[in-house]
Amino acid sequence: MPLVYAGVCSHAPGIRGRADQADPAAKDALYAAFDDQRAAIMATEPDALIVIAAEHFANFFMNNMPAFAMGMADFYDGPIEDPEWLAIDKFRAPGNRDLSQRIITEVMQTVDVTYAEEWLFDHGIAVPLSFLTPEFDLPIKIGRAHV
């Protein structure tokens, strides 16, 4: 039986980029929570991460904003924002094209979904991943919901 982990976390750009301005106790508690979540994820020995995040106009725009979009790539680059502003270096995270194609094929049966073979990660994905898979080495399958 597959083992699945589900979790949620904040993606505010200042979590990394302005960490020095935070109350030390609050920052330490948040970073500890990210450490706990990373440990819980790694305890499942995951083959891939499925990330659901908001799209911050990095890949889609008002004249072409799908309700739902899924990434289907061999890799994803990020962050699209200034690395100094986020305090996250540029990275390339592996994707899982086969898993993405299988999920997209099933979802398309009931949901109007767009897929993208290129996707630049913005802070909404880059910030959590910088804590949860800091080497950016776990294959990612992304989905975007317009909320």
Positions of the model-derived regions?
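Generic structural hydrophobic/aromatic packing signal, biased to beta-strands
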Residues: 7-9, 103, 129, 140-143
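General beta-strand structural signal in soluble alpha/beta enzymes
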Residues: 7, 51, 115-117, 143
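Conserved small/polar residues in nucleotide/adenosyl-binding loops
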Residues: 145-147
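A short aromatic-anchored loop/beta-hairpin motif
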Residues: 1-106
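Conserved ATP-utilizing enzyme core subdomain
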Residues: 109-140
